[in-house]
Amino acid sequence: MGSAPLPACLLALSLAGTVLAPGCGAAQGRLAHKLLHDLFANYSSALRPAEDTERALNVTLQVTLSQIIDMDERNQVLTSYLWVRQAWLDAHLAWDKDAYGGIDSIRIPSSYVWRPDIVLYNNADERFGGSMETNVVLRSDGHIMWDSPAITKSSCKVDVSYFPFDGQQCRLTFGSWTYNGNQIDLRNLLDTGDLTDFVENVEWEVLGMPATRNVVTYGCCSEPYPDVTYTLLLRRRASFYIFNLLLPCVMISFLAPLGFYLPADSGEKVSLGVTVLLALTVFQLLVAESMPPSESVPLIGKYYIATMTMITASTALTIFIMNIHHCGPGARPVPPWARRLILHHLARALCVCEVGESCGRPQREGTGGMGPRDPPGEGVEPGLCPRSRCLCHHHAVLSSVGYIAGVFRRHRTAQRRAAEWKKVAKVMDRFFMWVFFLMVFLMSVLVIGKAA
């Protein structure tokens, strides 16, 4: 008999493979069912899977930070989305993979096997839900790996002393709730948490997530209890607070010294100070609402309080200076020390000059630089005639003229006195304006320096 052609042989082999493939898959399924039945025939998930009950079972933990959902500074609670991986060896669930068609691993519900009761010690969730019920990966050598996502709420001590330029350290402490260190040896797989799949947060920047293993002995028990603590290093993104809270405060605080530059007769000097004070009070309330009620005052809060104190002082000084400005003709003369210090030295230093005066020349002590001199007929006693042809017998007329001249002199003296007090007020306004400008500048530099 002649041999069959080569194409016919290839077609027959391909058809045979097509027919046998479903049969192989069905065989694998039957072997997997048989494996599952054989493994859990006499298995109890309530007992710790250790061949020697005197030895501790090694459990490794690795946490992956996926997202920071919320940081509640007022209640001091951090809400985060984590992927928690736990791995251990269950000697009761090992099999020979050659006896089961080469099956090396299976995925089964986590409720089928024993699981370590690893919980978040500093949990702040009222429901205390824990991890999701996900499958575990069981390998032929008995190693079990359990990956489960979890949304955790952990307590975090928030220090707002340098808000909005602050950084926080939030700890996530994982440990067994009932097993001590002689029964479960909990260790971290890596020295840091995994941040490769982290979704960036708009408010917080994650600087790192180091992991440390601690062994703690509590007062209730003599056995040691190991735990793994992940420290989440956070730094606040301050741009939002700079543009919405800090810069408006700086600009408003620079308005306070300008109140001294307003003319005293405008009637708006005190109104400006009170308006600025009310605006800062509103911003202070906005900061207080978002901060936890603690003893530590935030940096921006200190800046607000210092600015409000400065504006209060400037408003009080404005009222005092306005009282000097409007003292009127009946006021006493300017004291010599005030005339020398304010009208001479400070006025020249601050270039506060009246019309026709020069800031470089000192004023004369007698007149204080106010008004023209007495005309040449004043100061002559009534009754004396400057010329020989004076009609001295008109005593009544001369007496009246002398009286009018005296009233005019007293009126001019009162006017000069009031003008001097007005200039004193103007010099003090200019002096305090520069003093408060310097104070605002120094406070702003201090805030920026502390932030750096």
Curated annotation (Swiss-Prot):
Transmembrane region(s): 240-260, 270-290, 304-324, 431-451
Main location per the UniProt record: membrane
InterPro entries reported for this sequence: Neur_chan_lig-bd (IPR006202), Neur_chan_lig-bd_sf (IPR036734), Neur_channel (IPR006201), Neuro-gated_channel_TM_sf (IPR036719), Neuro_actylchol_rec (IPR038050), Neurotrans-gated_channel_TM (IPR006029), Neurotransmitter_ion_chnl_CS (IPR018000), Nicotinic_acetylcholine_rcpt (IPR002394)
Modulation of this protein's activity: Activated by a myriad of ligands such as acetylcholine. AChR activity is inhibited by the antagonists alpha-conotoxins RgIA and GeXXA, small disulfide-constrained peptides from cone snails.
Gene3D superfamilies found in the cross-reference section: Neurotransmitter-gated ion-channel ligand-binding domain, Neurotransmitter-gated ion-channel transmembrane domain
Quaternary assembly: Forms homo- or heterooligomeric channels in conjunction with CHRNA10. The native outer hair cell receptor may be composed of CHRNA9:CHRNA10 heterooligomers. Found in the stoichiometric form (CHRNA9)2:(CHRNA10)3.
PANTHER family with a match to the protein in the record: NEUROTRANSMITTER GATED ION CHANNEL (PTHR18945)
Protein name, entry field: Neuronal acetylcholine receptor subunit alpha-10
